[in-house]
A protein has these predicted regions:
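N-terminal membrane-anchoring alpha-helices
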Residues: 1-63
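Non-catalytic C-terminal accessory region of glycerolipid acyltransferases
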Residues: 3-6, 133-271
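Catalytic core of membrane glycerolipid acyltransferases/transacylases, capturing the structured
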Residues: 24-45, 55-57, 72-129
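Thr-Gly-centered strand-to-loop micro-motif
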Residues: 65, 101-103, 124-126, 154, ...
Length: 271
């Protein structure tokens, strides 16, 4: 019922307000006495708590397909982007530390940005101009040598359920320059945690992890095309009702799904 859904969403929102600030404060106090890996896993504790509370308050569950496809070595994860859910959930469900690529401006966001600045992530400084990408590659290589996986969202912005954004080549370029394979990821989180909506919906998110794509000998356009083809085909498999044309390109979703999850302007890709 709508009123029950609203109450659950409100309780989840209050959880974020009440829980995030003290957790971030605890991180600030503890981080100076921890190495980078322990800092990361302490921060991931917040993500795990969020998934636990989202499950019991809002009925949001998830299942993972293809987890055996995750490699033992360095990798670049390129994922579909529909929701804030995947940003929170992926660190909690992946067996290795994840290194997000984000705009430097996010470091100045209270609590979230401050904690982010104490973790080993990759940041983009647009003021560096043409040297920005080289800086990202340098940071990413170092993080992968330390055992992390670099993760990006090639569409850059969160797309509506049933729609396909333009896949930018930055993630593919990074993987080629770093000499790492790409692991494509599809999911349908936009149904339960829609963008631009206070209301959350009960349901199960399917996260599908594809086999690694070797970047050796490929151009950025070729690698990007393979990633896009796999993700979009997989989206139509795990969420067929959201696409009016299962074999076509970008399409709007119909019915209730189409009303959830608008786009945003937070660029999370590289050119």
């Amino acid at each position: 019922m709508p009123i029950v859904r609203f109450i659950r969403s409100l309780l989840l929102f209050l959880f974020f307000i009440v829980y995030t600030a003290p957790y971030a404060t605890a991180c600030f106090i503890a981080f100076p006495f921890m190495n980078a890996e322990r800092r990361y896993w302490m921060a991931v504790g917040w993500c795990r708590s969020t998934l636990f509370v989202a499950r019991h308050l809002a009925g949001i569950r998830y299942r993972i397909e293809g987890q055996e496809n995750l490699p033992d070595g360095p990798a670049v994860l390129l994922s579909k982007h529909q929701s804030a859910w995947e940003t929170v959930a992926f660190p909690a469900i992946m067996p290795r530390p994840l290194c997000y690529v984000f705009k430097r401006e996010l470091l100045y966001v209270p609590f979230f940005g401050w904690a982010l600045g104490m973790l080993k992530m990759v940041h983009i400084d647009r003021k560096e101009g043409k040297y920005a990408f080289a800086s990202v590659v340098k940071q990413g290589r170092l993080r992968m040598k330390e055992g992390a996986w670099v993760i990006m969202f090639p569409e850059g912005t969160r797309t509506r359920v049933g729609q396909q954004g333009k896949y930018k080549t930055g993630g593919a370029r990074f993987a080629i320059d770093a000499g790492a394979p790409v692991v494509p990821i599809a999911h349908n989180a936009g149904h339960v945690w829609p963008r631009n909506s206070f209301i959350k919906y009960a349901g199960t998110v399917t996260v599908s992890i594809g086999k690694p794509i070797d970047s050796t000998g490929l151009t950025p356009d070729q690698l990007n095309a393979r990633v896009e083809a796999w993700i979009e085909a997989e989206m139509r498999r795990i969420d067929p009702h959201a696409y009016r044309d299962a074999g076509g390109g970008a399409s709007a979703s119909s019915g209730k799904a189409g009303k959830r999850g608008g786009g945003d302007r937070a660029d999370t890709s590289l050119g």
